[in-house]
Structures are given as C-alpha cells and as structure tokens.
Amino acid sequence: MPHSHGLDPNDPSGRRAFLGKLAATAAAGAAGLTLTSALDPEVLSAATIGAAPDAEHWLDNLKAKHKQLVDAYEPNDGWPLGFSHTFLATQSAAAPGNSVIVLRHFAMPLALDHSLWARYKIGEAFKVTDPATKQPAVKNPFYKPAKGVLLADDMSIDRLIARGAFIGACNIALNVLSGMLASNAGVSKEAAAKEWTAGIIPGITILPSGTWGVNRAQEKGCTYCTGGG
C-alpha cells in the first residue's frame, strides 16, 4: 500500500511538527539557527506554494516494469542514494528498473552543488559528515566524490543521474532551509532562496513540494522505500 514516512510540512499538523523539529535543531546550536529564522509564514503561504515550479512532466519517461521511489527526508549518511543504487544494480539486464529519489525536508540540501555548502555551512547545520575528511562537509560529499570515498562509487548523485535516476528536490524545504541559513552567508532570505535555486545540481528537478513528488511517483506505479534517518 502506498505510504510515506517523515514529517509533512504541507498539512497543519505536519507543519507544526516540521517547525518544531527546526526549533529543536536551533536549540542544539546547529550553525546558530534560531526558531524565529524558521518561522516565516510567507514560505508556507498558499501564494508561495502556488507559485512553485510546474513539474507535472518530471516522470514522463518513467516506463520500466520495475519502479521504486526512495523517499529521502533526512541525509542519513547518504543511504537514500545507496538504496537507489542497490535497487538499480540488482535488476536484470533484460528488465532494467527505474529509480526515483525525492529529496525533501532535511535531505533537500543534498540537491545542492559544492559552491553552497561552505558558504551556508550546510554540513555543520545538518550534521552531514564528509566521509573523506570525517569533518562537517564543506562541499556536497555525494556529488562527484573521489573514487573510493563512498561505500559504492555508483551511489553518487552524478552517477545515479547518468544511469537515468529521476531525482527531485522539495521547493518548500528549499525556501525554509535557505532562509534558516541565510545569515551564515550574510544575505537576505530572498537572496538565499535565489542562490539555492540556482545551485541545484544539473539533472535534478525542483518539485512544488517533496510530498507532491512522493505522491506523483506512487501514482506512476513506484513501490515505496523509505530513505531512513
């Protein structure tokens, strides 16, 4: 039965839980985040959501017999990418599969290119460790990493895209999280949102929301796999 895990920032109860978790992160002192930096009602307004990108044709080429969605709502040390890789790797040559990854909630920054990670202190804020340095990541550790850094080279975002994986990033999380970290880069929330939008890795589609993407993938016949975390 189709289902989903994690917090949904788009319904009222899910929104409260989502912002509550942001507050908990702030209380822990992650990169100086504060609750007030997260509470921007405009981000979750109907007007903002309604102006989100049109991605209805995102999955038009999702035509394999075997299709799986990985719902990534936490970075979880890159395991959502690993799940996509193992699903693709275990299909037969006669019946290859399609993999869909939705990067939403706190996993959304995995969709950003290297240039934004140090500038916004993303690794420090969301406790993403670079497996090469064992320190908070100052670049996206899952995008074009050196050979042998990841558990499997083919789980990197660039290689998954090259293998035909469909990857989408939540526009709601993009706006919420860029606003939270805007002060790290010394810019306004509006400027941060524009920079994050421009910094999406080529081949990744910005979705109206992550839950929208989870829904569309399942409507297209994908089985569901949680990204964990």
Language-model regions, residue ranges each:
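Acidic helix-start/capping segments at beta-turn-to-alpha-helix junctions
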Residues: 96-117
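A glycine-rich helix N-cap at a beta->alpha junction
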Residues: 121-147
